[in-house]
């Protein structure tokens, strides 16, 4: 496979790596290994929470995971639907520390987004009120912006300032 033949060169020459967590498990494991070997930041996005739950040990190896509020509820087996952003931040910090995940960004739809780190740091960014025409690709664009900022030295608290 390309990853077996050229994975070292690909990862070594990358500034960071973005991975879909629910890809083939062997591929995700190889990507995690190569990122650790070459000291590269690894960002994960989740599409299938059932697979993510099965791979919690792998998720601990990611520098940052991004999901929405419903996905975070599934990931931690809790109902976060009727909870304020502030309360969610405190709860997620506890969950992050127990799970040994590094950091998590949770999108909250029209309310905005929040981040939590396992060191207790957290932040909230209120969404700008705009007229939405189409949300296609919004989550991917958000994820890309976060990953690029963190790749080039921005801290989550700076990105949320």
Which residue ranges define each predicted feature?
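Surface-exposed charge patches
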Residues: 9, 33, 94
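Conserved phosphate-binding/catalytic loop of the ribokinase/pfkB sugar-kinase fold
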Residues: 1-16, 21
């Amino acid at each position: 496979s390309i990853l077996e033949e050229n994975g070292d060169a690909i990862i070594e020459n990358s500034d960071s790596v973005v991975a879909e967590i629910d890809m083939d498990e062997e591929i995700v494991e190889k990507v995690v290994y190569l990122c650790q070997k070459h000291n590269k930041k690894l960002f994960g996005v989740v599409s299938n929470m059932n697979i993510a739950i099965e791979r919690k040990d792998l998720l601990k190896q990611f520098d940052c995971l991004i999901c929405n509020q419903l996905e975070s509820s599934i990931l931690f087996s809790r109902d976060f639907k009727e909870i304020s952003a502030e309360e969610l931040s405190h709860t997620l910090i506890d969950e992050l520390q127990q799970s040994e995940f590094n950091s998590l960004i949770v999108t909250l739809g029209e309310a905005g987004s929040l981040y939590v780190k396992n060191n207790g740091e957290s932040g909230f960014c209120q969404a700008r009120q705009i007229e939405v025409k189409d949300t296609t690709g919004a989550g991917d664009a958000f994820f890309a912006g976060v990953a690029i900022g963190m790749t080039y030295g921005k801290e989550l608290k700076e990105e949320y300032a």
